[in-house]
């Protein structure tokens, strides 16, 4: 059962997810809305396509740090891995479906990566190894990245997390795969 402090933290996590790095950077640097540029997605990939590698890196880091901070603070305050995974889900949902932007956010991958590193860096390193193998096979980022993300629940089991925490990780994966389906 979630107590009132945890509930408030989940709401805050969702709202923090609403902070879209790509939107902020393009508004500050170019006074434009990235959602009107390129693919229209306020994420690192679109920023890289429209403005170059530096903007990709800045957006990736901003969104990843957002996920990492939410998860790291949750680990410190609450310690329960299941609740911490729930906060990762909340910040990702906030990034993908931000109420502040009428539900039109990014695809959640950068936020997921940052949050996962803060959740359990060993799982993140394991997934990095899996990604490298698939990257060498497919010679691209998208397909290996999505395959790697889909391996998270297996890693959760291998690293002895509870079934509930593993199911939450699976929900995160289904959500990310759904918004990245095209």
From Swiss-Prot:
Pathway: Lipid metabolism; phospholipid metabolism. InterPro entries: G3P_acylTferase_PlsY. Pfam families: G3P_acyltransf. Its main location: membrane. Its EC number is 2.3.1.275. GO terms for biological process: phospholipid biosynthetic process. Probably interacts with PlsX. PANTHER family: GLYCEROL-3-PHOSPHATE ACYLTRANSFERASE-RELATED (PTHR30309:SF0), INNER MEMBRANE PROTEIN YGIH (PTHR30309). This is Glycerol-3-phosphate acyltransferase 1. It comes from Bacillus cereus (strain ATCC 14579 / DSM 31 / CCUG 7414 / JCM 2152 / NBRC 15305 / NCIMB 9373 / NCTC 2599 / NRRL B-3711). The gene is plsY1.
